[in-house]
Amino acid sequence: MSETASWQPSASIPNLLKRAAIMAEIRRFFADRGVLEVETPCMSQATVTDIHLVPFETRFVGPGHSQGMNLWLMTSPEYHMKRLLVAGCGPVFQLCRSFRNEEMGRYHNPEFTMLEWYRPHYDMYRLMNEVDDLLQQVLDCPAAESLSYQQAFLRYLEIDPLSADKTQLREVAAKLDLSNVADTEEDRDTLLQLLFTFGVEPNIGKEKPTFVYHFPASQASLAQISTEDHRVAERFEVYYKGIELANGFHELTDAREQQQRFEQDNRKRAARGLPQHPIDQNLIEALKVGMPDCSGVALGVDRLVMLALGAETLAEVIAFSVDRA
């Protein structure tokens, strides 16, 4: 394909036909299991507080809003879907566009397709099994293996991530030639993420999908803390052939705790010189009413299609990557 022919799609038509078949297969998977498909807004007056996510911001100008109203493109449909759970919708899934103002590259596009679903009365392990079922059905891959975050660090880096201090983490980073970044980093979780990215991820999910679960409690995000070990959160991620595919939680249902976590995120943002983000008070109010105990997961569909088709880049499986949009 000519580099100057920017009008052309980034994906071939055969790839788009295969992608459509995979989307239909995903919908059949959930229809067969009685999971309701829903659609929620792509824009909201609130957004994520996570220091590692950069949302797009826009302004609405219309009747009653002559001065404009700030809106954010959704990085995930999570908050709206949880409000539906509180309203009594039962198990739900969504295939939707999500937006993150981050890098563009082999595995990234600022606009992408997300598959997200929630299962009331499922614990983390039962949802992991369902994710495994979906991957086997779509990718025709072997059944997944699982190991804890702690086991992964001990196996590949010979360090315990739950007890190591920052000095010990920097020593391991030096062995990975990461001292130029690690030596000036004061946030322990950022150091852990650095080691996970460069020391663990390249070693897992080579032959079969790999679940990594029980991330440190300090990285809980919207997940519950384990009742068996308060050092870890009921959170998992899935990796296959060098690609992070999904991130799942045994969902936090405590409104007060969720408010505190959002506020803590904003304090971290301020400390790093990042803008603080508006907290989604509609979600907090919904949690006060009571969300059923549930587990949920977000899966990158474009990456899933990449794996299914054996493509090398995301651009090969989406109609128009951002440089051709």
From Swiss-Prot:
Disruption phenotype: Cells have a reduced pyruvate oxidase activity and a reduced growth rate. Cells lack CadA activity (lysine decarboxylase). Pfam families: tRNA-synt_2 (PF00152). Its EC number is 6.3.2.-. ATP binds at R100, N101, E102, N109, E244, L245, G300. Changing E244A: Loss of lysylation activity. Changing H108A: Severe reduction in lysylation activity. Substrate binds at S76, P77, E78, Y118, E251. The keyword Cell wall biogenesis/degradation does not apply. SUPFAM superfamilies: Class II aaRS and biotin synthetases. Changing A298G: 96% increase in the affinity for L-alpha-lysine. 4-fold decrease in the catalytic efficiency of the (R)-beta-lysine activation reaction. It catalyses: D-beta-lysine + L-lysyl-[protein] + ATP = N(6)-((3R)-3,6-diaminohexanoyl)-L-lysyl-[protein] + AMP + diphosphate + H(+). InterPro entries: Aa-tRNA-synt_II, aa-tRNA-synth_II, aa-tRNA-synth_II/BPL/LPL, EpmA, Lys-tRNA-synth_II_C. This is Elongation factor P--(R)-beta-lysine ligase.
